[in-house]
C-alpha cells in the first residue's frame, strides 16, 4: 500500500469535507436569507 507520488488521501478527504461543509453552509444561509427577506 505504498502509493507513488500521489496526493495523500487525508488531504483529499480534508479538502472534500471542507468544501462540502461550505456548500451546505451556503445552501442553508441562502435558504435562511431568502426566508427572512420573504417575510
From Swiss-Prot:
Keyword Transmembrane attached: yes
Annotated keywords: Membrane, Photosynthesis, Photosystem II, Reaction center, Thylakoid, Transmembrane, Transmembrane helix
InterPro entries named in the record: PSII_PsbJ, PSII_PsbJ_sf
Principal localisation: membrane
One Pfam family of this chain: PsbJ
Family listed: Belongs to the PsbJ family.
Entry protein name: Photosystem II reaction center protein J
Species of origin: Synechococcus sp. (strain ATCC 27144 / PCC 6301 / SAUG 1402/1) (Anacystis nidulans)
Gene: psbJ
Amino acid at each position: 500500500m505504498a502509493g507513488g507520488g500521489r496526493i495523500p488521501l487525508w488531504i483529499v478527504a480534508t479538502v472534500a469535507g471542507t468544501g462540502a461543509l461550505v456548500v451546505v453552509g451556503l445552501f442553508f444561509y441562502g435558504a435562511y436569507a431568502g426566508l427572512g427577506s420573504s417575510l
